[in-house]
UniProtKB/Swiss-Prot annotation:
Protein name (database record): Succinate-semialdehyde dehydrogenase [NADP(+)] 1
PANTHER family xrefs: SUCCINATE SEMIALDEHYDE DEHYDROGENASE [NAD(P)+] SAD
NCBIfam families for the chain: PRK09406.1
Function, in words: Catalyzes the NADP(+)-dependent oxidation of succinate semialdehyde to succinate. It is believed to be the main source of succinate semialdehyde dehydrogenase activity in Mycobacterium.
Organism: Mycobacterium ulcerans (strain Agy99)
Length: 458
């Protein structure tokens, strides 16, 4: 994929960039490594917090321009782009306010270990490579940058090739906020350059959010080099609705959960599992609301669903839906790419999917919802867990016993009861199974790239 800004609403390439040379990449790594030696020793949490708050101030002040840039590069609606920008600022503020406490020394009972002092200390690892996706250009990269910088690490960002201007903006705003030169750099490079960067002995660790194949590649390289990694990969999140649920609220949340970010979110609800007693009512209401969504120009504030980010994404989704229909699945609404310029695919609802169909196990990264009927809670959980992924999940029920079953038995990194899966700075984010390992956000996220050092003083 070329490093370029291409407008998904028109297919027009707006701006292209030249990839960094090997020498330029080496210089960036050297700059980061040299900066780390000083940054970790000679900056305090208070100083870093001042710069992080200044970063948030700038992001908020420039929200309209940055939102427009993200919409231009990857097609998210202008309303969701603006919300993402403000959320990114919130992430910087959260770590500015909480990093010192999250990474404070943890005392142990010194007497029990025969010491005068005994405690755990969290120390930064060094240069961390972040390989980030296009679907949340600022929030995803920012939620790496904020905890990494506050912990005393320095960052190298290899962003997706279709959001280069968003990537450059983040490095620029961090520098303008006062973080020292070399603390956070964007590398405009292709995916093929990642291996060389990660194998460089000056790079201590890596984090990747992206596809399963990309995660396998980075995980294998990091494993070979014995370097810690965090992988946040795909998801095929279940959304279960039981008879006691507030059906209208569940349906409206299901619609939002499926088409958020034009359906291109790892934690978007993708597989909808309705109890047999309310299945027909759920499907009718769901199809009605999905069909009524406004699809169009993402810069129009009235648009609810914009284009997919790439032509390849649109074509892959169309093929997945066509294959399911050919195998006997029923298309309740949508189901065909929209005519005209841009990479649009309409909100689509599919039922009558059987276990032998590819759609039963595949992740669909767009506004396509699969709906399943469950005879009881046991079957609902069985369907929910019938995936190689385990990122997020939703369950709707007022029955407390059912809530406990879902919390305990759904195989996922996150379970949201009577609500939509959302990432919050205050809560750890990540998955199990083939959705990856490690955690972002909250205290767990900032500690991922710290040396957990045991200190014993006799």
């Amino acid at each position: 994929m070329p490093i370029a800004t291409t407008n998904p609403a028109t297919g027009e390439t707006v701006k292209t960039f030249t990839a960094a040379s090997n020498d330029e990449v080496d210089a960036a790594i050297a700059r980061a490594y040299a900066r780390f030696q000083d940054y970790r020793r000679n900056t305090t949490f208070a100083q870093r917090a001042e710069w992080a708050h200044a970063t948030a101030d700038l992001i908020e002040a420039e929200a309209d321009q940055t939102a427009a840039l993200m919409t231009l590069e990857m097609g998210k609606t202008i309303a969701s782009a603006k919300a993402e920008v403000l959320k990114s600022a919130k992430g910087f503020r959260y770590y500015a306010d909480n990093a010192a406490a999250l990474l404070a020394d943890e005392p142990a009972d010194a007497g029990k270990v025969g010491a005068s002092q005994a405690y755990t200390r969290y120390q930064p690892l060094g240069v961390v490579l972040a390989v980030m996706p296009w679907n949340f250009p600022l929030w995803q990269a920012g939620r790496f940058a904020a905890p990494a910088l506050m912990a005393g690490n320095v960052g190298l960002l290899k962003h997706a090739s279709n959001v280069p201007q968003s990537a450059l903006y983040l490095a620029d705003v961090i520098a303008r906020a006062g973080f020292p030169d070399g603390c956070f750099q964007t590398l405009l490079v292709s995916a093929s350059a990642v291996e060389g960067i990660l194998r460089d002995p000056r790079v201590a660790a890596a984090t990747l959010t992206g596809s399963e194949p990309a995660g396998q590649s980075v995980g294998a390289i990091a494993g070979d080099e014995i370097k810690p990694t965090v992988l946040e990969l795909g998801g095929s999140d279940p959304f279960i609705v039981m008879p006691s649920a507030d059906l209208d609220k569940a349906v409206s949340t299901a619609v939002t959960g499926r088409v958020q970010n034009n359906g291109q979110s790892c934690i978007a609800a993708k597989r909808f599992i309705a109890h047999a007693d309310i299945y027909d009512a759920f499907v009718d209401k769901f199809v009605e609301q999905m069909s009524a969504l406004t699809v169009g120009d993402p810069t129009d504030p009235q648009t609810q669903v914009g284009p997919l980010a790439t032509e390849q994404s649109r074509d892959e989704i169309a093929q997945q839906v066509d294959d399911a229909a050919a195998a006997g699945a029923v298309i309740r609404c949508g189901g065909k790419p929209l005519a005209g310029p841009g990479w649009y695919y309409p909100p689509t609802v599919i039922t009558d999917i059987t276990k032998d169909m590819n759609l039963y196990t595949e992740e669909v990264f767009g506004p396509v919802a699969s709906v399943y009927r469950a005879a009881d809670i046991d079957e609902a959980i069985e369907i929910a867990n019938a995936t190689t992924f385990g990122l997020g999940s939703n369950a709707w029920t007022q029955d407390e016993a059912e809530q406990r079953r879902f919390i305990n038995d759904i195989e996922a990194g996150q379970v949201f009861i009577n609500g939509m899966t959302v990432s919050y700075p205050e809560l750890p984010f990540g998955g199990i199974k083939r959705s990856g390992y490690g955690r972002e956000l909250a205290g767990h996220g900032i500690r991922e790239f710290c040396n957990i050092k045991t200190v014993w003083v006799g």
